[in-house]
Amino acid sequence: MSDDVLGLDQPIKLTKRTKISKIDLDGLMDKQKGLPFIISSYRKPLRVIERNDQRLAAKLEKKDLTSSQRRRLKYDNEFQNLQAILQFYQLWCHGLLPKAKFRDCIYLLRSFGARDTSLKRYRKTLIEAEINKKKEELGLAVPSEQPSTTQEYSKSEQRVNEPDDFFSEDEFYADPQDENLFVRPEVPHLEDIPNESYDAEMELLREMDS
């Protein structure tokens, strides 16, 4: 009979934890995979949404549709538009952090953005530049030179229609690769992450667009 009742002589099984790359400012500022990519490519999901809306308008022209059928078509269209936006950011997160789940990537981005002062200043610069642009369009401000931070990305935005190797628009219609896209119980709620907000600036942008 073995004297090792407690199993102290048994080999210990060690499980390897999946390593996730850390987010840093250099990675977020990378032109190919960082925030500049979103600035230069955000029109791609917008074109998908525009096509979806055009198809919806054509379907709604049919006079034999019931009210419930119309509501269903609108619901399906909103779902497809939301799916296109989510797919865009999922593909971007996969390029930024290939080993991270989508929800994990969002958590890391929110957490990093809440404490990094350089990223906060960068974000505020983009928001202020967009507000000034809206004011100029509405004639509320005299046109001025764009900050150097946005000039570089405005040039890259002009190349948005050029093909790139990062992803194609067809990928918006592919099934999400992340099986745990919405359910990650081990990850803290995003609302629990402290984050500096610019609610006043964003509210002003919404009022200008309305």
UniProtKB/Swiss-Prot annotation:
It comes from the Eukaryota. Component of the fork protection complex (FPC) consisting of TOF1 and CSM3. Residues 142-162 are annotated as: Disordered. It comes from Meyerozyma guilliermondii (strain ATCC 6260 / CBS 566 / DSM 6381 / JCM 1539 / NBRC 10279 / NRRL Y-324) (Yeast). Keywords: Cell cycle, DNA damage, DNA repair, DNA replication inhibitor, Meiosis, Nucleus. Belongs to the CSM3 family. Forms a fork protection complex (FPC) with TOF1 and which is required for chromosome segregation during meiosis and DNA damage repair. FPC coordinates leading and lagging strand synthesis and moves with the replication fork. FPC stabilizes replication forks in a configuration that is recognized by replication checkpoint sensors. GO terms for molecular function: DNA binding. It is found in: Nucleus. One of its GO terms (biological process) is meiotic cell cycle. One of its GO terms (cellular component) is replication fork protection complex. This is Chromosome segregation in meiosis protein 3. Pfam families: Swi3 (PF07962).
